[in-house]
Amino acid sequence: MEINNSNNNNNYVCAQHNRIEHANHHDLPDSDSDSSSREEELMNSSGGGNGKEPIGEKKKLPSHISEVISNERRESIIRELQQIKTISDYPSQANQYNLIEPIGEGTEGRVFKAYCIPLKENVAIKVVELDKMDPQFVKDVIKEVKVMNGNNHPNLIHYHTSFLENNQLWLVMDYLGGGSLADIMKFKYPDGIPEVLAVTVLKSLLKGLEYLHSHQRIHRDLKSDNILIGEDGAIELADFGVSAMFEKNTCCSRKTIVGTPCWMAPEIISERGYNQGVDIWSFGITAIELIRGKPPGYDLPPSKVFMNLLFGNSPSLQEEEDKGVCSHLYKDLVDKCLQKEPSKRPNASKLLEHKVFKQAKKNNYIVSHLLHGLTPCEDRYRESMSPASSNTPSPDSSRPSSPEHYNHGNVVNSPLQKNIKPSSLNKSSSSLELKNKNLSNPDLVNMPRAASHPVELNALELSSGSGPLSQSSDLPHGHLHKIGTPKKKHSPSGSIGDSHGSISPPLSTSPEKERKKGFFNHFRRHSIAKLFGSPKEGDHNHQHHKSEGDHEHHHFHFPWKHHHHSSSNNHVET
């Protein structure tokens, strides 16, 4: 559950939850329940959370906070944590850990590299500022802790313990010094990793999925941002904030819209109901992402991504196979995962039998090839936050100034640091700014990748299914603002996609085109409009005048922050 601020493009559609005043329930209900009433709600999430704040200049966290959480809420959280039974030697007192430096930040808080004094080892600690958090977010964090605590597999992130420190919730997890695979690719393999590395990573990922699915769990947000790499080459799947249970032998058991658009399966968008097959689809998209360095549709706004999912062909690596970038076996693996009909997709166990995995290597191959020459994730994070990095011309630079380095003497040195001089790295392309690639064509928008930082959906403009997104220079870092509804424009070709397999219907109309258009408009009214719709006429200030108890909000996760040691969620549920 580590946070790994990543940003290329992709955006989260995350579940709306009923607002709660206290977290004093014994068994947290799954966020998919009561979907009909949830469809009437719009989630009022704060855009970016703590991720908007620059890393502090203090050597340690503040000992006091201006606003104190109520005793009732504190006791409620303590009761929740006490119900999470762990078999762990990790201490549950803050004075037994030394925070070294931040390695990521997200909606719920910052993630620090820390040193466990009694055990003499490095860990990752997520620090959640409870006084700044809506109770729903705290509920989500505790839900994720429960899921992680139930995981017992080498390819799933390990949770150790959690406790309250003043008004902060500390979550202790594995420290994986390589950081997220998405971050590694941005720094070292921006155009994709070699097939043998991809196959090695994917095999470990499938083993983790096989375990999850055998325990009736769906991850629902599988992508390279949530794949963490250890200094020893260990590969672990993280970020269980939007995972869900499914009923065994049930074909369609979930209907919540949740995930990151570029990785979402068609059945999620069409609300037909789904099961673990959505993870297999996301796995196939991730397989493409590893070869190309980016997922299909990465440069499209969500509305166009959804259009392609509904009416376009499944993505394929045919071009890469023709060019010799990947083998026929690798392409075949992707094709099997990206069947539009969920029942035609193999399960994780069946996929592990695919011949392509015969070329998978051991973890030491990951160390010698994927991690070789890379500085540890905290160094890359610091570089991306440094003034030199932010001053480097970059189409998506939007990071605050550099924080001071958190130091402590008793630090377990990373093997990645040996004989490596930190180079002057350009800011990661995963920076979180929405930029129009072509000012003359504002409809062409480069979307950042999801990193579990929610923004208000009313700030998104959907005009005829293809309205642009924009970032206001007048707003705090990471905030989107609603731009004026543009006049209806048509490009000369009438294209609504790009050259990478997206649909581009001509301006001329036909019964088939009109049928699709009518269907999508109907679908958008009932689904997509809830995620991206603008406020009703005469209600332009609606989003700014909701009462505290107003339940109307969707949760749509966008990848605003640069995930370095991830887990935070970019997801959508409605």
From Swiss-Prot:
Q: Where is the composition biased (Basic and acidic residues)?
A: 24-41, 536-553
Tell me yes or no: is Mitochondrion among this UniProt entry's keywords. Answer: no
Which E.C. number(s) belong to this protein?
Answer: 2.7.11.1
Cofactors required:
Mn(2+)
The entry's active site is: D221 (proton acceptor)
A single GO molecular-function term is: protein serine kinase activity
GO terms for cellular component: serine/threonine protein kinase complex
Protein's recorded name: Serine/threonine-protein kinase fray1
Alphabetized Pfam families for the sequence: Pkinase
Key words of the record? ATP-binding, Kinase, Manganese, Metal-binding, Nucleotide-binding, Phosphoprotein, Serine/threonine-protein kinase, Transferase
Which residues fall in a compositionally biased region of kind Basic residues?
Answer: 478-491
Q: Which residues bind ATP?
A: I103, G104, E105, G106, T107, E108, G109, R110, V111, K126
Residues modified as Phosphothreonine are T256
Q: Which gene encodes it?
A: fray1
